[in-house]
Amino acid sequence: SGSCEVKTCWKAMPPFRKVGNVLKEKFDGATEVEQRKIGSTKVLVPKNSQFKPHTDEDLVYLDSSPDFCDHDLKNGVLGTSGRHCNKTSKAIDGCELMCCGRGFHTDEVEVVERCSCKF
């Protein structure tokens, strides 16, 4: 009949939140590895022999992250001591997380400001 059908396909990313959740899950289960030479081939094996070998889908790392809680100029880490935090927040600005479980001091401050109130 002379008619034809066109089908177009493309790949699309899942919602950003879903990608973030998958990456966080992989990060939490990441395995520290070391490089070993087996014959003429270099392979990555778990640093702890009690861990199972990783798959192509697993997240692995060679070097541990620095401790961002403590002052370490060699690694460019300023630490968290003396920073202001949000006492009620459970996010990264929250005192429990930012202060690395070391505790924190609270100050109550009263701020008096002029406002453009009309009565």
Curated annotation (Swiss-Prot):
GO terms for cellular component: extracellular space. Disulfide bonds join 69-100, 85-95. Palmitoleoylation is required for efficient binding to frizzled receptors. Depalmitoleoylation leads to Wnt signaling pathway inhibition. GO terms for molecular function: cytokine activity; frizzled binding. It is found in: Secreted, Extracellular space, Extracellular matrix. One of its GO terms (biological process) is canonical Wnt signaling pathway. Glycans are attached at residue 86. Keywords: Developmental protein, Disulfide bond, Extracellular matrix, Glycoprotein, Lipoprotein, Secreted, Wnt signaling pathway. It comes from the Eukaryota. A lipid is attached at residue 1 (O-palmitoleoyl serine). It holds the Pfam family wnt. Its main location: secreted. Ligand for members of the frizzled family of seven transmembrane receptors. Plays an important role in embryonic development. Belongs to the Wnt family. This is Protein Wnt-4. The lineage of its organism: Eukaryota, Metazoa, Chordata, Craniata, Vertebrata. The gene is WNT-4.
